[in-house]
């Protein structure tokens, strides 16, 4: 769950600059198989979760981490009264789930949508967003969809897949944009809901129409 209005735009830029490095996950996954990917992702995810545990239960470590990256953390991450996962932990959990659940092509696209669409939607939505759409801005959600279609087309070409595949993953992007806009009120972290919805809808369409993936 995120509310992008809770930190300054400059800090949002810095946060998303770090966030985009997660694109290394689908790029590297393109060149390796699922077991290898999971053997890398699972330990890294455990490390991020352990760091969150230290932040919550160890006051000295919490003070140190807040001093280093506190300006990039959202209020619900800083002012925690219960165990709260940071954005990095949610991204890593999402990566493991996406790679584990979905076929490789769909997983790569679903995770790319999470990283790129969420980033551009947040930045554009905060900069020019004026029209409310669920809990976000219409401008941000349209940016999410446009970037998503570009992502889907690019990966479809890389995978040498057909038009049905492109339509399926683009439809998944459409529903992911809606889910992202509603994630805050649904009390679901958008880092989880975006790839699960994008990948799930895409896979269902391809399964129903017996499409290639």
Feature roles, as predicted:
Residues 1-40, 53-155, 163-213:
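Interhelical loop and helix-boundary elements at the membrane-water interface
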Residues 41-45:
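Short alpha-helical "patches" and their helix-cap loops
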């Amino acid at each position: 769950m995120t509310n992008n209005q809770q930190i300054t735009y400059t800090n949002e830029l810095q946060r998303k600059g770090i966030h985009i490095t997660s694109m290394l996950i689908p790029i590297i996954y393109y060149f390796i198989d699922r077991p290898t990917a999971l053997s890398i992702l699972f330990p890294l995810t455990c490390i991020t979760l352990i760091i969150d545990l230290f932040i919550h239960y160890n006051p000295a470590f919490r003070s140190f981490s807040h001093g280093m990256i506190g300006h990039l953390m959202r209020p619900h991450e800083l002012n925690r009264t219960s165990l709260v996962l940071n954005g990095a932990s949610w991204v890593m959990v999402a990566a493991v789930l996406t790679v584990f659940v979905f076929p490789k092509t769909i997983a790569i696209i679903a995770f790319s949508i999470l990283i790129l669409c969420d980033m551009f939607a947040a930045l554009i939505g905060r900069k020019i967003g004026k029209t409310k759409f669920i809990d976000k801005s219409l401008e941000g959600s349209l940016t999410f969809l446009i970037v998503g279609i570009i992502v889907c087309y690019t990966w479809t070409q890389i995978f040498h897949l057909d038009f049905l595949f492109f339509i399926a993953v683009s439809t998944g992007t459409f529903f992911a944009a809606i889910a992202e806009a509603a994630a805050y009120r649904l009390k679901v972290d958008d880092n989880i809901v975006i790839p699960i919805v994008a990948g799930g809808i895409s896979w269902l369409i391809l399964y129903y129409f017996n499409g290639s993936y």
